[in-house]
Design a protein with these regions (language model features):
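PAS-family sensory domains
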Residues: 1, 65-80
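Sensory-domain boundary/capping and coupling elements
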Residues: 2-8, 82-94, 100, 104-111
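Sensory modules in modular signal-transduction proteins
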Residues: 3-30, 35
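Sensory-module boundary signal marking interfaces of small helical input modules
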Residues: 81-84, 134, 185, 250
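Conserved long alpha-helical elements within nucleotide-processing catalytic cores of c-di-GMP signaling
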Residues: 89, 100-125, 132-162, 168-172, ...
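Cyclic nucleotide signaling catalytic output domains
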Residues: 167, 194, 198, 204, ...
Length: 255
């Protein structure tokens, strides 16, 4: 077979290749390429191993040098792979039901808030919000309705929290709020009361109308703990004290 025939077969073979492929000679001359490569805008032929094109797609460029000094360039669309990786990262740090940060991300946000407070000589408040009698309600309504109720609770609580603060799902019927950069403890009580008011409004689940309440425990950095673990533990103790004293109230640790 002549060189011309070999080249013709090569061009035909890669013409309909599913990825963008280009074969170049040692002097950089384009010998053959797939239709997909030919259709690429030059701006989409980046030099980086992975890059985002002008139209938003993620592409991976692989370049292999041949024995004769030529090269094979492969550009693969990895947009779906990137989306899957982003989804996996999101799930690693967020609750699947509510979309809120999970305990893992909560711990990280607490550490960040404490570091900021130490630099600026401020306080950090950790609030644990436990819904009163939710388990019995969940058993009565069914888990599907209970999940819908928890999503609505999460949305209402989120509306009470500043962007700089963190609302997380800490347990089945428990939410945590980290209020950072506090100057005064009274500001934390205002936040707690807003959370209670948000839950006091009537809920609708299917054809049912429901009322919810919550017991809230609060701990403060640095007075009640020097790290996130201590703050969460003491907020939990304060929350249980609120339940012991009749529920539907706010209690500060040690008070």
């Amino acid at each position: 077979m002549s060189k011309a025939d070999e080249l013709r077969l090569l061009r035909e073979a890669i013409k309909t290749f599913p990825d963008a492929v280009a074969i170049r000679s040692a002097d950089g001359r384009l010998i053959a390429c797939s239709d997909l490569y030919a259709g690429l805008n030059p701006s989409m032929r980046g030099d980086s191993a992975e890059y985002q094109s002008a139209d938003g797609r993620w592409l991976r460029r692989t370049l292999r040098t041949l024995d004769d000094g030529g090269s094979v360039e492969l550009i693969a669309d990895i947009t779906e792979l990137r989306r899957a990786e982003q989804a996996a990262r999101f799930l690693a740090y967020h609750d699947t039901l509510t979309g809120l940060p999970n305990r893992r991300l909560l711990d990280d946000r607490l550490r960040q808030a404490i570091r900021l407070a130490q630099r600026r000589d401020r306080m950090v408040a950790t609030l644990l919000v436990r819904l009163d009698d939710f388990r019995q309600l969940n058993d009565t309504l069914g888990h599907g309705a209970g999940d819908a109720l928890l999503r609505e609770v999460a949305q209402r609580l989120a509306a009470c929290v500043r962007k700089a603060d963190t609302l997380a799902r800490a347990g089945a019927d428990e939410f945590a709020v980290v209020v950072c950069d506090l100057k005064d403890k009274a500001d934390c009580r205002v936040v707690a009361e807003k959370l209670q008011q948000a839950l006091a409004a009537e809920f609708r689940v299917g054809n049912r109308r429901l009322r919810l309440a919550a017991s809230i425990g609060v701990s403060l950095f640095p007075a009640d703990g020097g790290d996130g673990e201590a703050l969460l533990r003491n907020a939990d103790a304060a929350m249980y004290r609120a339940k012991e004293l009749g529920r539907n109230q706010v209690r500060f640790f040690g008070r």
